[in-house]
Amino acid sequence: MLDTGGGLKKAAWFFQDSRGHSGKETPFILHNVDVLSTIDLERMRQLHFETQALATLAVQDRETSRYLLFDERRQLCGRRAGRNQPPELVRPAQQARAWAFSGIHVISPRLLAMMTEDGVFSIIASYLRLAAQGEKILAFRADEYDWRDLGKPENVAQAVQDLK
């Protein structure tokens, strides 16, 4: 297991020729396999295109063990281990908002060449490093959508019950 960052970097060859018919770079969706959601991927992709972000991350205002921090322009500026833990800022923010990452990203292929990490690594490490360098890693607010973590058997069983 290479974690999300290591796995994506290993598959980078697949995205090397990412130019569409228009000759413009074609972003792709990266979606954690253990997530079930109704998040509008087309709206998310459209926001990504409109803002020319390097990456756009689906986030929600919900309880989690780790939070990503975003500034007033919805740009990634840090992370926090828990809601009551001190923030770890990688760039200044007047007011950092803590949102839970949903494991769904829209990524511009140019990100792949910027990933300097090797081996097993979280893509969040790349995002934080790139945000510190001024790259645009944006939040897509997805509070109005359903989202479930299916990483535990009991969560899968509950989702099956709810979908009946």
Predicted regions and their residues:
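Acidic metal-phosphate-binding loop of nucleotide-sugar-dependent transferases
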Residues: M1, D34-S37
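Short phosphate-binding loop-to-helix
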Residues: M1-F28, E88
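Short gly/pro/ser/thr-enriched loop/turn and capping motifs at secondary-structure boundaries
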Residues: L2, E63-S65
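Catalytic-core segments of class I nucleotidyltransferases/pyrophosphorylases
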Residues: H21, E25-I29, L36-S37, L41-F49, ...
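A short, conserved acidic/glycine-rich loop-to-beta-strand motif
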Residues: T51-D61
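A structural signal for short hydrophobic beta-strand segments in well-ordered beta-sheet cores
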Residues: L68-F70, A139
